[in-house]
């Protein structure tokens, strides 16, 4: 698994995705394809339940622990949480990320909610392709 060179991208395609989170806390939401980098610009979670709070878990699995050219990580982890058991009040919205996060080919975004159907996750992204 190589890191795509973002200087030589052949296309940049933006988009949005929405998920109604299940109570399977390790559900796969997306996997980054080969020769792609996913730039996540924003992640929000809205609690659509009018009376009860719900917790959200969101993490990236499959991260490379080898680093990239010019970086030698020490103690890098292949699984990292962006949010872990974070409470989202009823009828409220939580911003999980509002600055860019890059996911590389093979990285997997996973997550879920403490109550099935209570949380909607929205993300805005760009796919950078060097194929």
Regions found by a protein language model. Give the residues of each.
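Short structured motifs
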Residues: 25-28, 81-82, 95-97
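Short, surface-exposed beta-strand/strand-loop-strand elements in extracellular ectodomains
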Residues: 50-84
């Amino acid at each position: 698994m190589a890191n795509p060179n973002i200087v030589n991208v052949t296309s940049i395609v933006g988009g949005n995705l929405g998920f109604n989170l299940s109570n399977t806390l390790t559900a796969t939401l997306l996997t980054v394809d080969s020769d792609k980098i996913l730039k996540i610009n924003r992640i929000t979670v809205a609690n659509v339940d009018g009376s009860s709070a719900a917790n959200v878990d969101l993490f990236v699995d499959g991260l490379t622990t080898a680093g990239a050219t010019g970086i030698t990580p020490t103690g890098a982890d292949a699984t990292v949480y962006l949010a872990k058991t974070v409470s989202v009040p009823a009828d409220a919205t939580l911003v999980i990320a509002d600055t860019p996060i890059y996911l590389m080919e093979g990285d997997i975004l996973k997550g879920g909610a403490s109550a099935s159907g209570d949380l909607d996750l929205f993300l805005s992204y760009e796919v950078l392709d060097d194929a």
